[in-house]
Amino acid sequence: MRLYNTLTRKKEEFHPIDEKEVKMYSCGPTVYNYFHIGNARPFIIFDTLRRYLEYKGYNVKFVQNFTDIDDKMIKRANEEGITVKELADKFINEYFVDAKGLGIKEATVHPRATENIDAIIEMIKKLEEKGFAYNVDGDVYFSARKFTEYGKLSHQSLEDLELGARIDVDERKKDPMDFALWKAQKPGEPAWDSPWGKGRPGWHIECSAMANKYLGETIDIHSGGQDLVFPHHENEIAQSEAANGKPFARFWLHNGFINVDGEKMAKSKGNFFTVRDIAKTFDYEVIRFFMLSAHYRSPINFSAELLEQAKNGLERIYNCLDNLEYLKEHAQAEKITDSERELQNRLLGIKAKFIEAMDDDINTADAIAAIFDIVKEVNTNINATSNSSKEIIDFSLSLIKELGGVLGIAQKSRQKVLDKEIEELIERRQKARKEKDWKTADEIRDKLKEMGIILEDTPQGVKWTIQR
């Protein structure tokens, strides 16, 4: 398996430090609002990477943090007239609602910055002892120039970074590129006791300390959005490697932006859409499928039209699964035939292409294309007139579900309660048609259509599918 490493700017063969376990840290949300689809992209992409690593047999220790204290949190809490903790609790709960809808597995650990203050203070003390940090009236800064490899992730010198960076102007800093590790308390802000007086941690040190606490000094994979390369991830490397004297992360993975009308989506630009809002029109799974339809490092354009295309694509897969479920119930033959064995071998060949795509820097676009190739083969060879065996139907069903599971899609099955209700309505419609009560038959068809049920007459009887 090869992954593109931002640190080396090339694809490299991935082997974890421990041959059986992968240690992975992914930057989570700042919990002051519902997350938008720009935030959702890394959550979905790196959940998919985790799923694939687990599929390959690794135990993945996956840590995703919650930033639950920073300037945005304090500002929003003051606007709402609630505490920062109440705000964080609310939006952490809302995160899990949206994440569950998107099929994002819970992390092994979801640490909150405010619950790891001791670990953060310990790391800052270590940096101070080693001469990488200095205290100015209760504010503690990291000396960027003392870390000689600063800039190695963004592949720029300190001078270049200084010219192009948005830097907090603070005359008390020894160098403009120095950044805050600890911020002295301001009136009305939450604060914790520390050797430098009451205050709160800086953003960058939170991730370094939590990764160190839960995964150790050197981890296999650190991931996040492209916008985090500098300064956040650059600063994490500086802090962690200065404190521990060891490489922090062996692989750095970053996803591309989501654009709206050619511009990066961002809360600051006001051109963002929350996942919660989009899910009112499109199913959460459609959003996930949309994200996986492009290579994760490429920019992706957002539009309702593209979401509609994703919906149609996902529906093709589900219709194939529904068809297989239906044929399985009515299959007469048990044993696989020679021609079906040939089909099985062709499907296994396509599965190999799926694996090849995922092994090539998690190329989910090509992996989805492989699933569509399987769907095409199945639809052509296993249908109402093919008299297919239960064995080949079961094999095809399992294969689509297996590969879909790697991507976190196509795992839903028709609800049994819904099945019963629909079957009863279809039976009533059939009875009405026999009695030439066309009015009732049409009314039932219309009702089913409103429920998103499409009817199809087949030699085995009426077949129905859910329009998702």
From Swiss-Prot:
Q: Where are the transmembrane segments?
A: none
Put simply, this protein is called Cysteine--tRNA ligase
Mention any one GO cellular component term assigned to this protein in its UniProt record.
cytosol
The family annotation for this protein states:
Belongs to the class-I aminoacyl-tRNA synthetase family.
* Location of the protein in the cell: Cytoplasm
Q: Does the keyword Aminoacyl-tRNA synthetase apply?
A: yes
Q: Which organism is it from?
A: Acetivibrio thermocellus (strain ATCC 27405 / DSM 1237 / JCM 9322 / NBRC 103400 / NCIMB 10682 / NRRL B-4536 / VPI 7372) (Clostridium thermocellum)
Which parts of the sequence form the motif 'HIGH' region?
29-39
Residues making up the signal peptide according to the UniProt record: none
Q: Its catalytic activity?
A: tRNA(Cys) + L-cysteine + ATP = L-cysteinyl-tRNA(Cys) + AMP + diphosphate
